[in-house]
Amino acid sequence: MLFFAVLRSFGYDFYPVIVKCLFGSSDPVVPTHCAAIVTIDGISYYTDVGLGLPSPVVPVALIEDQGWQPETISPNFYSYKAHLNGNNVMLEGYNVSKRMSMVSFVLQPAELVDFIPLNYYASMAETSPVTQGIIVEMFTDRGTASILKNKLRISSDDRAEERILETDDDLKAALWEVFGIKVSGE
């Protein structure tokens, strides 16, 4: 994985973990995501890329009562707080409009081979968010842009705009105009 190769090239001490993406769900959630726990000066941090939904924009220190990270609560990004129960960790997310459980994981190193069945499930299961629609997210210096299923959300400068992409042409136009992704064919 590219993220792990980058961490390794900079000499970081890290290990992969298997993550459940909760996003406030009260239903049982299958673990389908990979993140890394990086240790710096004896402190473990949750680091994540490629989540496709609101993921931490900074490494989150896994210290109980650490407070929100980053400290500034913004409508454009979620701030995170770690809740630890032994080796079990839940990260709570908060922005100006929502506060909810975001991800959970166990502080146990995973092997990359452990992700093969998770990747298969995420790409094939009817209940997987990946098979239910498009997931795209991009961070900018002023906010985020995302498409989840058929909803386009653009956040910048403390404002958020949402709109439903009603047709395939609307989706293709948004992918091109907002993300620079050109889709051809059906």
Show the residue positions of the predicted features.
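His-Asp-centered catalytic microenvironments across diverse enzyme cores
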Residues: 19-163, 169
